[in-house]
Amino acid sequence: MGYEEAFFRWAFLIATVYVAYYFLVSSDKKLATKPQKSKLTKLGKQKQRQKQKNTKKDTLVNRETPSKKSQKLETSDALKSKSKDSSKKEPVVVPKKGTPKIFQENHKVKKVKSPKKEKLVGKNPAEKEDTTDVEDTQKLEQKHSTTPSSLKMKSSISLAAITADDSLHNSFSSNDIDDGFQTVTSSRSYGKKKSTEPLTKRQRQNQQKKLRAKEMQELADEEQRRRLAAHRKELHEANRPRGGLNNSSRSAYSYINNGQAGSSKGNRYDSLW
């Protein structure tokens, strides 16, 4: 009886363990499969919502497009009409010299633009348009000028020569003009032209400072010259030739010239000792 009881007990334990293991494994499988299904369902629902939103937007756009197209057409027609109106230019009426004033008042006279100025305006938009009458400059010069062409050429050459000479004589350094001093307008041919405006307090102070600095520089230059002159004098006295054969200031060449250091008769070092 002891063996049978032991066998039944072991069989019961093994069966309970197997049943517990089976239930645990099945529950784990269910937990693993459930979130995947929920995720898939959520993604499907989100896609459906996006599709519904897109369809609503498409319907709204399709409803609004004809009105927008009509607005675009209206704006394009208005622009075309404006461009046509601007392209139509009124004819320019230029009165002759003998026309009366009544004609000029009735017919508005427009001033013709010069072609040269129009080109300049096109290059630089900041410049204003010039509405002066078109007149040939060469013809005006021929009318008003009484000097012949030969004299004109000579005068231009002489002016060029004068300016070249003046630039050599009247050349000024950058130190002559300063921001804090009196304003000076310099030109190549006529030198300097001082302005008639009175000096301010700051300009006067700067001018006084410059004058003081100039005086101090002159004093320093004079002192330097004196020192250099004294130094030159000392050097001259030191290098002056002195009498006597046994003088320490004499050079070796003086002995050779006298025939003492370089002579073969006497002892070479007698005069030195």
From Swiss-Prot:
Locate the compositionally biased regions of type Polar residues.
145-154, 245-266
Q: Could you list the residue ranges that cross the membrane? A: 7-25
Give compartment(s). Cytoplasm; Membrane
Keywords for this protein = Cytoplasm, Membrane, Transmembrane, Transmembrane helix
UniProt keyword annotation of Cell membrane present: no
Superkingdom to which the source organism belongs: Eukaryota
Cellular compartments per GO CC: cytoplasm; membrane
Q: How does it sit in the membrane?
A: Single-pass membrane protein
Q: Where is the composition biased (Basic and acidic residues)?
A: 55-91, 115-144, 213-240
Q: What is its main location?
A: cytoplasm
- Record field: compositional bias (Low complexity): 92-101
Query: Where is the stretch described as Disordered?
Result: 34-154, 168-273
Write out the biased-composition intervals (Basic residues): 36-54, 201-212
Disulfide pairs? none
Record-given protein name: Uncharacterized protein C13E7.07
